[in-house]
Amino acid sequence: TVVRMNRDTYYSAAVIDTTQGATLTIPETNGRYLSVMVVQNDHYIDQVFLEPGTHEITSDTDFAMVTMRIRANQSDPGDNDAIAALRAGVKLEVGGNASHVRPNYDMEQLVALRDELTVEGTKLGTLMGMQGAHGTIEPMMHLYGTAIGWGLLPDAQAQYLGSPKFANDGCYMASYAAPPFNEPGFFSITIYDADGWIYTEDGILNEFNMNLNEDGSFDAYFGECGEVDNNLPTVEGWNYILRIYEPRLDELQEFRLPEMKKIS
């Protein structure tokens, strides 16, 4: 079970035997964001594919999860058909056919450790440096990333800025500078409960359902705030992640989440 999921994209995934090679073919996307990451069995990601064409998959581990994200407009029911057509054009060809056997984890111990690491890791305020290729990530940072959000994209493909937890005791507001990204990237805010789960269908802000200022900046409201734009409902211990896909990393070095102000 993966915490801190999102509804920005449709996911498709397959666990494959990599020992006999594999290829992935991506069709033209007509400007829509589509990425495919290869998550190896030790949770490192050496390959992320965005360009149309046929790509060779390589892995240091015998098994890997090939995970595709396709940008979705959750405000448009008709968008499902366009996504289905695009997904049908993606081809994954795998030489091996061995089955992956999941270890028999002690789930009580696993969840307790995950929660402890999440508390420590979220104090950093960003998930930068928590995912990437073998040999590029500090082991402790990689462990934090695995606990906070399994399947994070590497820094060059996405940035994740996480908030602390807040009380469900009124209305909060924050003013955000325009998040820096390259096309076909985008940004979003997704809200979670204290344990990292999505608890409402209305828990996301992105370009399809929010109002932006002319310069791309925006105000967001959290909780019972009356008739305001960009308002997300809250529960006790609510928190959020600002995701930036295809980020401009040089501009993100100084980018931080704004102060959260309690206004009522």
Residue ranges and their predicted role:
Residues T1-S264:
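A compositional/structural signature for long, glycine/proline-rich flexible linkers
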